[in-house]
Regions:
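N-terminal secretory/targeting leader peptides
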Residues: 1-82, 91-305
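Basic, amphipathic alpha-helical recognition segments used for DNA target recognition
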Residues: 88
Length: 305
């Protein structure tokens, strides 16, 4: 975030001629992350880089958010941009948030989702008994194939693995680097389960409605650049990690084959989408439409029949 959020703030300030200034506060400085949503609704916070994933229990469109999708729906940044920007998933999320007093600026990449381990995980069958820190639908996937997933704050993950409480963890790749998890997990498993993991920019509707049209345009234009920059930085730094850092860290990269990818897609991801369509989509037409869009996209890409 240090590579992209300060430049976004600077761009808004410069393009607005100093009329619109955003003050940066990092996670937890103003409110706990679960309080971001109500704080935006109340206009206590005006803008946040957050995710509907965190509130999928109370925000039905959270089930459509990129970080909550099961593995191998999107397999490239181009897939993500096609699905969210062109086929209408961002539109559906934005409509759902608008009803809850949130103006939605859109989804963006925060890097690809992988997992890593103390021991080699060479195939899907090796997941049995694997104790792993993951999140959302990734936890559901792990459990389906015999692993034992838990949810744990990122700063606690290193010690849990070092002490043997966990065998590994998974999330956006850069946390493997930033938390030095390569010191306790020398095996990095791919391909990425989510390409990419996503987050979103939310604005308090009250704050957004108070902006004149020219400043709204400034924020929207800066958001487009923010999305591009975030994706570019994540991609460049991930490539550097694979090309250079793995050797320095002593990391072994293990990439599963097509059979395992197809098996996850067929045995878990598609049934997961069908379940969401049935259980959530039956109550919320936006979710039903979104799941239909996602499945048609996967068919068009040849990922499912």
């Amino acid at each position: 975030t240090t590579y992209v959020i300060p430049p976004f703030i600077d761009m808004v300030r410069e393009k607005s001629g100093g009329r619109l200034n955003i003050t940066l506060h990092y996670a937890g400085e103003l409110v706990d992350y679960l309080e971001v949503f109500p704080s935006l609704q109340a206009n206590m916070i005006q803008i946040s880089n957050t995710s509907t994933l965190f509130w999928r229990g109370s925000l039905n469109v959270g089930w459509l958010q990129a970080g909550n999708l099961p593995p191998f729906v999107c397999r490239s940044l181009e897939d993500f941009e096609e699905l969210y920007y062109k086929r209408g998933i961002d539109r559906l999320i934005g409509e759902g948030l608008a009803e809850r007093d949130i103006h939605f600026l859109g989804s963006h990449s925060v890097g690809n989702t992988y997992f890593w381990s103390k021991k080699p995980i060479n195939t899907l069958d090796d997941l049995k008994g694997f104790k792993v820190r993951f999140f959302g639908a990734m936890n559901d996937t792990m459990e389906h194939f015999g692993a034992s997933p838990v949810m744990l704050p990122h700063p606690e993950t290193y010690m849990a693995i070092a002490m043997g409480t966990l065998d590994g963890s998974g999330t956006a790749w850069w946390l493997y680097r930033d938390l030095k998890l390569y010191e306790v997990c020398p095996y990095f498993i791919g391909p990425a389960w989510q390409v990419p993991q996503g987050m979103e920019l939310w604005v308090s509707k009250k704050a957004w409605d108070a902006l004149p049209d020219d400043l709204k345009k400034v924020v929207e234009e800066a958001t487009v650049e923010f999305n591009k920059t975030f994706a570019k930085v994540c991609d460049e730094q991930e490539k550097e990690m694979f090309a250079k850092s793995f050797k320095e860290w002593g990391t072994t990269y293990i990439e599963w084959g097509k059979d395992d990818i197809d098996r996850i897609t067929k045995e878990f991801s598609l049934p997961f989408l069908n379940k969401i369509e049935q259980e959530i989509g039956s109550k919320d037409p936006r979710v039903a439409e979104g799941i239909q869009i996602i499945k048609q996209f996967m068919k068009d890409r040849g990922y499912i029949n």
